[in-house]
């Protein structure tokens, strides 16, 4: 995933299935010119410590020059167990960690991929394309998270993804390759932060809903899973 700052700096995450020497990088002018971000320590061996990016994926920069990164903790090397997912944010100018949220143990094994950030209101919306697809809402003001799940808009459609003229294939539970069917993945906000847009990676439908309904749901449900029917009704 790639994101750019207002002054043209470019940052990218490196997919865990193609793990290299870094999980999060800043791309600089010139061929093959990049450096680990924010430093080498955060790009250390996956699973080697608390302050390490194990599987950096979705990245986004907000209006305050904070680089937000979702680390879903899967695709660990040497058959190691997945780690707890975390959401972190770094100041791109000082390279300092300015926010961190460690998801509960129950979130281990989920596949949080893309994210949309409302830095002004303090909410982050994350697409979880795992076996139980969901939109995860993180309230950074109160350090809480909630899930919106069990809705048809989150599911993959029976549509093939074509890459360079070929069907995208993923291994099934038996290791056999089959056409990918990935649920909710792309997710973004309108410029004013009022509307959330999302869809499945395998699909042709783009959905929208009031971001306010997600924010209010996160504050109205102090515990458990967010199952607000008004959110489902608001999806178009």
Language-model features: where?
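Beta-strand-rich domains and repeat architectures in extracellular enzymes and scaffolds
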Residues: 1-22
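Beta-rich, blade/repeat-based domains predominating
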Residues: 1-7, 48-66, 105-124, 154-195, ...
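Short loop/turn segments immediately following beta-strands, especially the blade-tip
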Residues: 140-145, 208-221
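Asp-box/WD-like beta-propeller blade repeats and closely related beta-sheet repeat scaffolds
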Residues: 74-123, 127, 133
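Blade-loop segments of beta-propeller domains
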Residues: 30-76, 80, 85, 99-105
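A short loop-to-beta-strand structural motif that recurs across blades of beta-propeller domains
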Residues: 22-25, 85-88, 134-136, 205-207
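Conserved beta-strand positions in repeat-built beta-propeller and related beta-rich domains
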Residues: 12-18, 61, 69-73, 78, ...
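A short beta-strand motif characteristic of beta-propeller blades
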Residues: 34-49, 98-105, 146-147, 170-177, ...
